[in-house]
């Protein structure tokens, strides 16, 4: 990028950071070169308001083909009857659902943010918590898992118009069939936000919400390993028509066809047999990481994981998430502080550290390597003031990064 050396330098610095750090943020992954090539294509030049073959601009014959291919691949990948690939993000996808199915003042019920939910599921700082009445369900205090009987009771008490089942920090499987039963009992719509587990659902390694939910939203990165973006799915074409209008002109203008092309590439990659093998490794690697940390005396929320998320409860070692986040950052491990169920600390401090296995699995990290990662993290957290251990940890991180390079060729 000779025309802008300042930006070129920052991009190269970011590439170097990704190559030399262990990426354990659960919401991040590494897109393939093919996905990035599509996103960096000339499709970025084309405005295409509307849907394929129903545009407000001329010259859309080729972007129509791109978007229709993305739609068809998404439907086939998830077994849906309808799909909209235009949402710019998962939050935009959720907002489109709210606009199409709800009126301001209606009640929505989602998982409490501090228990693993998401901002867009009714948090008071988000538009979902400002435009709608909200109520939230929590995990059981003893098991730290969803208690469907308690959720049913909460739904009956509050009579929500929409129930959301989904999370940003819940490491266990979701019983979509049980949620459907509750939604039917209170005559509510059911929305599944599978942003974190979409790749596992696509691989058949997590139960699919499509047969049970009125609408399904997701991001296209995370475990799906595509570009940053959103996606809406449904088994109901009539609801789909409402959702199309809610996306455009309801909440967005022109779609990002270069990103949609990258989504199409990612959907094709996710339909390959190799992707299921990858997803199996994502889960097995997360289990190894969880088990290793527990062996070292660090508590894990719900005592394990069924997906890519490993949530550390640092109260077990007398540490806050804020401190732990900085400690692992100092040895080139990227994670994020996170609330845990019934957390006494503020969201700016927290008692937890959230880890995810998807990105390092993309790099080729195997179970042995994830065991090593668990030991490096434990060494650092259990010996925060030991400079010798800190130095050894940095060296081990460097060794692992060299053993499992991010990209095998220049990008």
Curated annotation (Swiss-Prot):
Residues where N6-(pyridoxal phosphate)lysine is found: 222
The keyword Amino-acid biosynthesis belongs to this UniProt entry's keyword annotation: yes
Entry keyword set: Amino-acid biosynthesis, Cytoplasm, One-carbon metabolism, Pyridoxal phosphate, Transferase
Site (Plays an important role in substrate specificity): residue numbering on this chain: 221
Catalytic EC class: transferase
Pathway terms, separated by semicolons: One-carbon metabolism; tetrahydrofolate interconversion; Amino-acid biosynthesis; glycine biosynthesis; glycine from L-serine: step 1/1
Gene3D superfamilies in alphabetical order: Aspartate Aminotransferase, domain 1, Type I PLP-dependent aspartate aminotransferase-like (Major domain)
Subunit structure: Homodimer.
Record-linked HAMAP family: SHMT
Family per similarity comment: Belongs to the SHMT family.
Protein name (Swiss-Prot/TrEMBL): Serine hydroxymethyltransferase
């Amino acid at each position: 990028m000779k025309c802008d050396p300042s930006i070129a330098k920052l991009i190269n610095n970011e590439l170097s950071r990704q190559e030399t750090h262990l990426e354990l943020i659960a919401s991040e992954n590494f897109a393939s070169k093919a996905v990035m090539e599509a996103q960096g294509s000339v499709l970025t030049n084309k405005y295409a308001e509307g849907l394929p073959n129903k545009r407000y601009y001329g010259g859309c014959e080729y972007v129509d083909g791109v978007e229709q291919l993305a739609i068809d691949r998404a439907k086939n990948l998830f077994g849906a009857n309808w799909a909209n690939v235009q949402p710019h993000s998962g939050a935009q996808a959720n907002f489109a659902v709210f606009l199409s199915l709800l009126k301001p003042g209606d009640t929505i019920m989602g998982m409490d943010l501090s228990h693993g939910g998401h901002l867009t599921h009714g948090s008071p700082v988000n538009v979902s918590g400002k435009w709608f009445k909200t109520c939230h369900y929590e995990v059981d205090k003893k098991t730290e898992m969803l208690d469907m009987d308690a959720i049913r009771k909460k739904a009956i008490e509050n009579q929500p118009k929409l129930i959301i089942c989904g999370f940003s920090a819940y490491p266990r499987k979701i019983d979509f069939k049980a949620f459907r039963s509750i939604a039917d009992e209170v005559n509510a719509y059911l929305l599944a936000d599978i942003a974190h587990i979409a790749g596992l659902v696509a691989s058949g390694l997590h139960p699919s919400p499509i047969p049970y939910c009125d609408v399904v939203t997701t991001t296209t990165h995370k475990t799906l390993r595509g570009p940053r973006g959103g996606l809406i799915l449904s088994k109901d074409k009539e609801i789909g028509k409402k959702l199309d209008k809610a996306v455009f002109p309801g909440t967005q203008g022109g779609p990002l066809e270069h990103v949609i092309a990258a989504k199409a590439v990612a959907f094709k990659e996710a339909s390959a047999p190799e992707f299921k093998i990858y997803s199996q490794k994502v889960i097995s690697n997360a289990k190894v990481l969880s088990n290793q940390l527990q062996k070292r005396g660090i508590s894990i929320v719900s005592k394990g994981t069924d997906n890519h998320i490993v949530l550390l409860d640092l109260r077990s070692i007398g540490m806050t998430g804020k401190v732990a986040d900085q400690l692992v950052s100092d040895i080139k491990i990227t994670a994020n502080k996170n609330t845990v169920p019934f957390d006494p600390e503020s969201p700016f401090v927290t008692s937890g550290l959230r880890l995810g296995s998807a990105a390092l699995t993309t790099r080729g990290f195997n179970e042995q390597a994830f065991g090593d990662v668990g030991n490096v993290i434990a060494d650092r957290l259990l010996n925060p003031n030991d400079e010798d251990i800190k130095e050894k940890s940095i060296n081990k991180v460097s060794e692992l990064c060299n053993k499992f390079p991010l990209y095998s060729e220049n990008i």
